[in-house]
């Protein structure tokens, strides 16, 4: 039987491989029934190239992105119009030739001057004493010839309760007017709620029936006064005897200081409050209060919201000068009620008091005489009275010291008279009957030495110019149409053409004065001195 071997593929091997194959072939017949031993072989290297990069190159896509386009715009600006101008100095002029100095005879000129000297001096003295041009002034501005009402201010809620305007005051800038609401007639005032209101007259769109600030007060307000330098601070005196200070720049919580109900507090209504500089610190101020309990007290604000008593005075009947013949007071009453105060413009310690008994009293803050009183006080009370003047026929509700003369002051009483006094004599220099009813206020003008104003119980404000007449008013202004009393008035020391007056109808009227009452004459102060001298002699 014949066998045919199938062909195997040809493979190149190395020499070692060939030798092994030859040896294996020789003994193959002998070992054909068992496997041959394993041997190492070294094979050729086969490389397979990567297809990934080429595939990614085919499949990949290139993308790009950016933010949205930024919109920009350009513009230019310049003045709407322009103008060009050229300037230069004027063409110089040739100076005129200096005239030759004339020749004169020195001896003859000297003789002439000696001869006329006495005559020229005599004429100059005559001109100095002449009154030919008194009152002549150049009018640079238009003259206001009438007195007109600029504003009629009223708080409807207070007016609806029948409250009176008991006090008014201008602030230190002259732009804000404050008024106190209370009562000055019969009635139970102890539980009467009242108000303090302010109006800024310089504010645009002024509403005369809507105050800028309203402060509600639990007791009737009898008087008030703005701080001399702090435009928003107001001191007020109440019917209950308390003294309060408000800061009107804090309308939500305006109360700054108060005396509280202590042994130092007044026991009767406070009729006047004033601000006084402290003796050693002129930029600091304290509050002075005067009441019908006979006490004049000085208060200083503390950090605890309290007014602390620093000094006090009491008016005891037995300590008044002997020239004062007061009616015998009721049993147990030894104090003289105070109704008004005015300080001298020339001596900060000198002041005048108006009293319920009708006597104006000259007083001093420097007094060290102990007051004979049993009223309780945390500080020693002094007796301030130095001199007593002849009385009115009733209580003196207002006194005013002249800002131009150290010795003159005015007083107004319920007898309807205004008295002009000198500090140097008891009798008044002159007495003017201005009303058949009470006079509640009198004030000197801050700019005219011979002008003053008075408020009457017949509803009039009367303006006097003593340069024109010393017996009758120059102008009488009707404040109330029904004759209701005018209780208070104040000149504006900053805007001197303004005069404010408050009345029993609950209204405050601001009057614009004519230039005749606001422009001082060239010799007015001298005329005031002469008036005092003529009346005194």
UniProtKB/Swiss-Prot annotation:
Inactivation phenotype: The majority of deficient mice die in midgestation from 10.5 dpc to 12.5 dpc. The mutant embryos exhibit open brain, spinal bifida, microphthalmia, and polydactyly. Inactivation of the protein results also in short and stumpy cilia with an abnormal accumulation of ciliary proteins and defects in Sonic hedgehog signaling.
Family: Belongs to the dynein light intermediate chain family.
Subcellular location: Cytoplasm; Cytoplasm, Cytoskeleton, Cilium basal body; Cytoplasm, Cytoskeleton, Cilium axoneme; Cell projection, Cilium
Organism lineage string: Eukaryota, Metazoa, Chordata, Craniata, Vertebrata
Pfam families: WD40 (PF00400)
Subunit structure and binding partners: The cytoplasmic dynein 2 complex consists of two catalytic heavy chains (HCs) and a number of non-catalytic subunits presented by intermediate chains (ICs), light intermediate chains (LICs) and light chains (LCs). Among them, a heavy chain (DYNC2H1), two intermediate chains (DYNC2I2 and DYNC2I1), a light intermediate chain (DYNC2LI1), and a light chain (DYNLT2B) are unique to the cytoplasmic dynein complex 2, but a subset of the light chains are also shared by dynein-1 and dynein-2 complexes.
Single GO MF annotation: dynein light chain binding
Cellular component, GO, one term: cytosol
The protein's name: Cytoplasmic dynein 2 intermediate chain 2
């Amino acid at each position: 039987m014949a066998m045919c071997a199938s062909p195997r593929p040809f493979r190149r091997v190395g020499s070692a491989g060939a030798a092994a194959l030859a040896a294996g072939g020789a003994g193959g017949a002998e070992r054909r029934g068992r496997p041959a031993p394993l041997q190492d072989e070294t094979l050729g290297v086969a490389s397979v190239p990567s297809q990934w990069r080429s595939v990614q190159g085919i499949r990949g896509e290139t993308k790009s992105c950016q933010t949205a386009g930024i919109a920009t715009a350009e513009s230019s600006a310049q003045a709407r119009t322009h103008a060009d101008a050229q300037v230069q100095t004027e063409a110089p002029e040739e100076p005129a030739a200096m005239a030759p100095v004339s020749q004169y005879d020195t001896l003859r000129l000297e003789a002439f001057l000696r001869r006329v000297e006495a005559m020229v001096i005599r004429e100059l003295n005559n001109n100095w004493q002449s009154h030919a041009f008194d009152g002549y002034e150049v009018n640079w501005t238009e003259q206001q010839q009438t007195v007109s009402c600029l504003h009629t201010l009223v708080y409807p809620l207070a007016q609806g309760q029948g409250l009176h305007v008991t006090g008014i005051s201008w602030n230190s800038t002259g732009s804000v007017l404050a008024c106190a609401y209370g009562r000055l007639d019969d009635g139970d005032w102890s539980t009467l709620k009242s108000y303090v209101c302010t109006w800024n007259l310089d504010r645009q769109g002024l509403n005369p029936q809507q105050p800028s600030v309203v402060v509600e007060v639990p007791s009737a307000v009898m008087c008030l006064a703005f701080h001399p330098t702090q435009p928003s601070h107001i001191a007020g005196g109440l019917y209950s005897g308390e003294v309060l200070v408000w800061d009107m720049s804090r309308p939500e919580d305006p109360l700054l200081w108060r005396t509280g109900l202590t042994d130092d507090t007044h026991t009767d209504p406070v009729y006047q409050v004033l601000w006084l500089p402290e003796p050693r610190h002129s930029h600091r101020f304290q509050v002075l209060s005067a009441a019908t309990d006979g006490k004049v007290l000085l208060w200083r604000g503390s950090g605890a919201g309290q007014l602390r008593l620093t000094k006090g005075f009491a008016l005891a009947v037995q300590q008044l000068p002997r020239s004062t013949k007061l009616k015998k007071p009721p049993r147990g009453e030894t104090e003289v009620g105070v109704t008004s105060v005015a300080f001298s413009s020339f001596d900060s310690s000198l002041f005048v008091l108006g009293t319920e008994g009708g006597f104006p009293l000259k007083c001093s803050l420097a007094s060290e005489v102990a007051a004979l009183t049993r009223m309780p006080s945390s500080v020693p009370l002094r007796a301030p009275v130095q001199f007593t003047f002849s009385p009115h026929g009733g209580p003196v509700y207002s006194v005013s010291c002249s800002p131009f003369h150290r010795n003159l002051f005015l007083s107004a009483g319920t007898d309807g008279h205004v008295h002009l006094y000198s500090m140097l004599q008891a009798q008044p220099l002159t007495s003017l009957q201005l009303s058949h009813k009470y006079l509640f206020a009198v004030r000197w003008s801050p700019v005219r030495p011979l002008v003053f104003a008075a408020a009457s119980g017949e509803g009039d404000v009367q303006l006097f110019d003593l340069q024109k007449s010393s017996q009758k008013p120059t102008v009488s202004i009707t404040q109330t149409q029904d004759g209701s009393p005018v209780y208070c008035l104040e000149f504006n020391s900053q805007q001197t053409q303004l005069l404010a007056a408050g009345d029993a109808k609950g209204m405050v009227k601001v009057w614009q004065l004519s230039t005749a009452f606001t422009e001082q004459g060239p010799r007015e102060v001298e005329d005031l001195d002469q008036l005092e001298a003529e009346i005194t002699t």
